[in-house]
């Protein structure tokens, strides 16, 4: 009998990881949603408690991070205003290896590469198809545009629908290029 999945884990073929990194993603997605539930017998007497999940508190899109091929930039970034985008040379504000390793707690990002990303069941159903399509993002003035790849476009579409993408700086995976970085 088919049982629906709770999550989809996206892994690029050049990502190096161990199973502990997977469990860290699950923990990031569900830790704030853990609740203790009472278990009652047929007479209504509490006989034990069990750990459950409050689905409304589950983080829907969570990611670890990895360095990109330059060894300096990471897979997660923050959307910039038009003015800041121009000042930054037409490049979004990616976390660097240096900046992300100083962080100690999960934080929100505007987008993440899909090399190591966990997505809760129901996210795709709330987004318009096609879910992964490069798109031209147009800034408010209409004068500046940025062609976004499919993973960036997915995250920005999810954000428009009220979903939040989380990154845990403690979940670093390897990225095998000409060397593992």
Language-model regions: role of each:
Residues 12-16:
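The conserved acidic donor/metal-binding loop of glycosyltransferases
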Residues 108, 133, 138-175, 180-181:
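Catalytic donor-sugar/metal-binding loop of nucleotide-sugar-dependent glycosyltransferases
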Residues 18-137:
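Conserved catalytic core of nucleotide-sugar-dependent glycosyltransferases
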Residues 1-5:
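Conserved small/polar residues in nucleotide/adenosyl-binding loops
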Residues 8:
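Short aromatic/hydrophobic "clamp" motif used to bind/position activated sugar donors
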């Amino acid at each position: 009998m088919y049982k629906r999945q709770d999550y989809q884990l996206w892994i690029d073929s050049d990502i190096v990881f161990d199973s502990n990194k997977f469990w860290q993603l699950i923990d990031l997605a569900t830790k704030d949603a853990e609740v203790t539930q009472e278990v009652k017998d047929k007479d209504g007497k509490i006989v034990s408690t069990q750990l459950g999940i409050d689905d409304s508190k589950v983080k829907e899109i969570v990611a670890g991070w990895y360095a990109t091929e330059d060894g300096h930039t990471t897979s997660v970034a923050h959307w910039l205003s038009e003015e800041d985008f121009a000042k930054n040379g037409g490049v979004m504000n990616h976390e660097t290896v240096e900046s992300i390793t100083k962080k100690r707690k999960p934080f929100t990002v505007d987008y993440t590469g899909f090399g190591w990303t966990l997505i809760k069941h129901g996210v795709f159903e709330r987004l318009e198809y096609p879910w992964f399509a490069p798109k031209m993002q147009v800034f408010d003035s209409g004068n500046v545009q940025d062609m976004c790849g499919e993973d960036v476009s997915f995250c920005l579409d999810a954000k428009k629908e009220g979903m939040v993408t989380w990154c845990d700086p403690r979940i670093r995976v390897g990225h095998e290029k000409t060397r593992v970085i």
